[in-house]
């Protein structure tokens, strides 16, 4: 088992911690704030626009300016994978005008709670009020 340290408890940090823990790693998140997902809480006017339900070709045509750069990321974990992740974790979602995907509850806090629950179930350790100022490699590794 490897130890994985993640700097920042936003949406990306929480997702990274879940997938790292699912792969059998000991995971720690270092978050400078008092809670996780602080910016996620305010997205979509507090409703949290989780993703877009359009097909991937439409997504690339309308959102991405450098398709080759983003191709592997978008196809490595698609918008449907995001929807499946949340529904499998117990958060029902709905699709609204413009193919925008929101939690059925219309509360971004439910998205954060779902991520936190997954992290807790996987044993992810969170260190609040922790600012990382420097990362140093020793003997060729971090």
Model-flagged regions — what are they?
Residues 1, 96, 129:
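Phosphate-coordination loops involved in phosphoryl transfer and adenosine-cofactor binding
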Residues 2-29:
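N-terminal Rossmann-like FAD-binding beta1-loop-alpha1 element of flavoenzymes
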Residues 4-7, 27, 111, 123-124, ...:
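Hydrophobic aliphatic residue packing
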Residues 8-13, 37, 44-46, 129:
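Glycine-centered flexibility sites
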Residues 16, 39, 137:
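Short glycine-/acidic-enriched loop or helix-start segments at secondary-structure transitions
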Residues 32-125:
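Conserved N-terminal/central alpha/beta ligand/cofactor-binding core
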Residues 128-141:
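A conserved short coil-to-beta-strand element within the FAD-binding core of flavoproteins
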């Amino acid at each position: 088992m490897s130890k994985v340290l993640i700097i920042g408890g936003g949406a990306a940090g929480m997702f990274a911690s879940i997938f790292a823990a699912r792969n059998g790693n000991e995971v720690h998140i270092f978050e400078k704030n008092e809670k996780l997902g602080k910016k996620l809480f305010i997205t979509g006017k507090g409703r949290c626009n989780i993703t877009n339900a359009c097909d991937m070709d439409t997504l690339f045509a309308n959102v991405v300016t450098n398709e080759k750069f983003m191709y592997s990321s978008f196809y490595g974990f698609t918008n449907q994978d995001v929807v499946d992740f949340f529904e499998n974790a117990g958060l029902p979602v709905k699709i609204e005008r413009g193919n925008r995907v929101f939690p059925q509850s219309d509360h971004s806090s439910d998205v954060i709670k779902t991520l936190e629950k997954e992290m807790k179930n996987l044993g992810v350790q969170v260190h609040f009020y922790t600012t990382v100022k420097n990362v140093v490699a020793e003997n060729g590794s971090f």
